[in-house]
């Protein structure tokens, strides 16, 4: 085959015309020291705060300390894969996480990588992990109820969509159980739930996922897990990642619920990272910005205005106390940030009162605004009555003869405490809660022995479902009790009591 000179020159001209000068410039630094999940890097002069950095062997980091002569970065991965002298590349992007509907039903780690063995997640969008919370103009007051399905909470410490309600208590008092019941109760409520496991045992996370699968709640839930065996950097980041995933749904006009279990472990992880980065320690060796660590996370929970789509992000953070001390540094910080707290007490838990809520110390600062009118009508004075009952019960231990009114109050209180007990993983529809609390507060249970209350509850609800379904439907639709409806409920209670054998 003979090549003509004209063809060769034409081909060369075409190649020269199509030639593009491509110069790929990337700023590179060198690891000067590495250890305890933190790397010191020299040479990244233009690095941004919270920027993602690319290290060898697929390890990523995030710049936390920007100092004169080096950058302190936390690593998301095994620091044994990185050694002194390794090259570090800037990515030019701050820390991001994959978000979207593709993550629903999956278990991911703190950087959005799936760890449930179901293959990769092809998320179409990503969001910055740490963003500024919505401003005042973008919000509206919390006024829509988020039903937990727990009688004690929905009646006395109501939670609204967009609220931040702290669940606080010692270890093994049922904190996670409240979160799981709330997640299970969101089934069919158009609410996406994100459960963030921070610093927990892997076995505990497996149990949570299995429980959610068993009750069909994984269909609307994302689990973000940063277990105790993972680096402190992952435990520090996980709550922000969970929050960013929730914000995606909030900004689409949907409702989301994020459960942070628990923020005490996040504070421990942040303290560890900060001390290794040589940040000055403050009270209890925490860095000075540990309040900001939690406030900037929890402020992102919001009920957006109608102009912004009307979506909401509700936060249920958990704090673990030591020996019931709510006056510790981290507990007081988070109590002051949130819109109320549910305080769980070991003494009540061991006495068989579950959920073990101390009504006197628990509060919702949103209050009745987050309840439907029917619940406000039946449970308005319940909190006060129960708090009075607790005081009287303590006093009655020393008094031999009590007057009739005091005895009646104690009797009613015992029955209400029994009525508010609830088994785990059986959240109750709000219309059923209203009828039961109505029966208790109107004195229809006063003539029943305390031991028969549970049997009455189960029997009455099955009687209503089989014969008086119209009452449930009416409460659901009207959302308030008029005199006619009250009479219908009273008649149903009296009719059932005729056949009820305690």
UniProtKB/Swiss-Prot annotation:
Superkingdom per UniProt: Bacteria
Predominant location category: membrane
Example GO biological process: proton motive force-driven ATP synthesis
Cellular component annotations (GO), alphabetically ordered: plasma membrane; proton-transporting ATP synthase complex
Compartments where located: Cell inner membrane
Assigned EC number: 7.1.2.2
PROSITE patterns per record: ATPASE_ALPHA_BETA (PS00152)
Record protein name field: ATP synthase subunit alpha
Organism whose genome encodes this protein: Thermodesulfovibrio yellowstonii (strain ATCC 51303 / DSM 11347 / YP87)
